[in-house]
A protein has these predicted regions:
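Interfacial and helix-entry/exit segments of alpha-helical transmembrane bundles
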Residues: 56, 127-141, 179-196, 217-241, ...
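Central hydrophobic cores of alpha-helical transmembrane segments in multi-pass inner-membrane proteins
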Residues: 16-36, 55-68, 106-120, 138-140, ...
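Juxtamembrane/interfacial segments at transmembrane-helix boundaries in multi-pass membrane proteins
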Residues: 2, 72-93, 193-254, 284-304, ...
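Structural signature of hydrophobic alpha-helical transmembrane segments
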Residues: 11-21, 98-109, 151-164, 233-246, ...
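Alpha-helical multi-pass transmembrane bundles of energy-transducing inner-membrane proteins
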Residues: 32, 36, 45-50, 130-228, ...
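Transmembrane alpha-helical segments of integral membrane proteins
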Residues: 251, 451-466
Length: 534
């Protein structure tokens, strides 16, 4: 496979093609919608065309992107590079590349987007062309965040994400959709403004001494950050951190998330939980740690961040326990899971960093799966309240099977994808912060309690409501959505070595940049991570 990919010069064109394909799809959708409206041919047939064009675009993207897995060299640093001038007078370039951190998030995005489209196949029946066009634009922006090697390009993509998601929630969401959409936009936009100031400051500081032209390339920003005073680096760290903390979201910046999840359509919730939240933790790994190592290792700063992370882990679990709405419960569980990711990042051990990467990938699959399952129930019963269900395992055996698999992944049952990440985060964090790691471990038990309780209320309580006795089981489309996720849940859980092997060199390099005393040999970092397999 690698030889074939080299023969077609795969690495030289794959990233710009992945960014361009959704935009081409969106253009086709809007052109088709315009022509259909002029010809007075709008209706179910026209809407189906929009759905198939979107699904086809995402399937092509996924198929093409699988080559990244085979062509990626774990020891190769930045790969699949594409660089061209964009706004040269301002030192801004259209520069793309992937490394052992970003490649997984790109693959997660291309894997989940066609599944997400299937989730709204029948439930979205108004302005279908616009709806799917917005999702295509959203996909380009999300991928751009993970691919960008120019910091200004990173910021542009970061902000573009807000616009389609605002309209998706605000137009196709629930009863309080405008409140949730506005809250989402305001929170994330205000945090991002501070990051913009920091990026401009660094780009100007890296300006060419002869021409005075700013330089926003990642390498230039990384180099100039080390020449600034400790006070400057402290303020710049917090400017970046504000944007990332809101997006993660880290406690106490999380209050926009439950409302956005509850009001968003299923497809929006899947993208929000599985991909958008990862932009925040990706930002920590890409910018906060390597640009400001002295701030990250400063005990005062580090302890505050770790305290917020562990508070979020416990808070999310406790609040989830008292929820009566299935979707809101999963939203608060996301606060808990993402707090665990931040704990792993700032514990700064080889194990905890690998665990953080694995937890965020596993969270994307498990939480995405849970939102898909909740969406199926809502399509049938138009409610998400636990009190409306009970005994569904008897009438929906397929649904019960896939919901149990999703729950097993979420609570990190051994053999599923969730286990290896949580195990590495907790064991790695225990080396440097045993008390915080112990507290976080308690939250894992709480997570099992609230998710299993939800499972009992939906599947195993008495089947005593007439509406539930005739509820149909999953159809072929819904099985097609869930089967790939279920397969990946068990594949990663039983064979995580290929993922760990691809991320380990880059994470070791990151630790070396931040805190050389934390570096350990790769043979002791993660048992089995050097193992074979693709």
């Amino acid at each position: 496979m690698s030889e074939f990919l080299q023969s077609i010069h795969y690495g030289s064109w794959i990233l710009p093609v992945l960014l361009a394909l959704p935009l081409v799809g969106a253009g086709i959708l809007w052109l088709h919608g315009f022509v259909a409206e002029r010809a007075l041919r709008t209706g179910p047939a026209s809407d189906d065309t929009a759905r198939w064009v979107t699904l086809g675009t995402f399937l092509v993207m996924f198929i093409v992107s699988t080559g990244l897995w085979w062509a990626f060299d774990p020891h190769g640093g930045w790969q699949f590079e594409f660089d061209t001038a964009w706004l040269p007078q301002w030192g801004i370039r259209f520069s793309l590349a992937l490394d052992g951190i970003s490649i997984f998030l790109v693959l997660l995005t291309t894997f989940l987007m066609p599944i997400a489209v299937l989730s709204g196949w029948t439930s979205i029946d108004k302005r279908v062309h616009t709806y799917h066009g917005l999702f295509l634009i959203l996909t380009t922006a999300m991928l751009g965040v993970f691919m960008a090697r120019d910091t200004f390009l990173f910021y542009v993509m970061w902000e573009v994400v807000l616009v389609p998601m605002f309209f998706i929630i605000g137009i196709w969401g629930g009863e309080r959709r405008m409140y949730a959409a506005t809250k989402f936009f305001v929170y994330t936009f205000l945090g991002s403004l501070l990051m913009l100031v920091a990026i401009l400051y660094l780009g100007l500081a890296a300006a060419d001494p002869v021409t005075g032209r700013p330089d926003f390339s990642y390498d230039a920003i990384l180099a100039v950050a080390q020449t600034l005073s400790s006070t400057e680096r402290l303020w710049l760290f917090f400017a970046f951190f504000a944007a990332f903390a809101v997006k993660i979201p880290l406690f106490p910046f999380h209050t926009w998330l439950p409302d956005a999840h509850v009001e968003a359509p299923t497809e929006g919730s899947v993208d929000l939980a599985a991909i958008l939240l990862k932009m925040g933790t990706y930002g920590l790994l890409r910018f906060s740690l390597p640009l400001f190592p002295d701030v990250v290792t400063n005990p005062a700063v580090r302890n505050v961040v770790l305290a917020l992370a562990v508070t979020g882990v416990i808070y999310g679990a406790l609040v989830a326990l008292v929820q009566t709405d299935f979707k809101r419960l999963v939203a608060y569980s996301s606060v808990s899971h993402m707090g665990l990711v931040v704990l792993g990042i700032f514990a700064l051990t080889a194990e905890s960093l690998q665990g953080a990467m694995m937890v965020q990938l596993s969270h994307g699959l498990s939480t995405g799966a849970l939102f898909l399952m909740i969406g199926m129930l809502y399509d049938r019963r138009h409610t998400r309240l636990f009190s409306a269900f009970g005994g569904l395992a008897r009438v929906m055996p397929l649904y019960g099977l896939f919901l149990m698999i999703s729950v097993m992944s979420s609570i990190a049952v051994p053999g599923t994808n969730g286990f290896i990440g949580e195990f590495l985060v907790l064991t790695g964090s225990f080396q440097t912060y045993p008390v915080l790691a112990t507290i976080a471990t308690v939250s894992v038990v709480l997570a099992a309690v609230f998710v299993l309780w939800a499972l009992q209320r939906v599947l195993f309580n008495p089947l005593d409501k007439p509406e539930n006795m005739t509820i149909p089981d999953m159809n072929w489309r819904e099985v097609a959505m869930m089967a790939p996720i279920a397969a990946l849940i068990f594949y990663i859980g039983l064979h995580p070595a290929p993922l760990l092997r691809r991320m380990e060199p880059r994470l070791q390099e990151l630790i070396q940049q931040v805190d050389p005393t934390s570096v350990r040999t790769s043979s002791t970092a993660v048992p089995g991570s050097a193992g074979g397999g693709n």
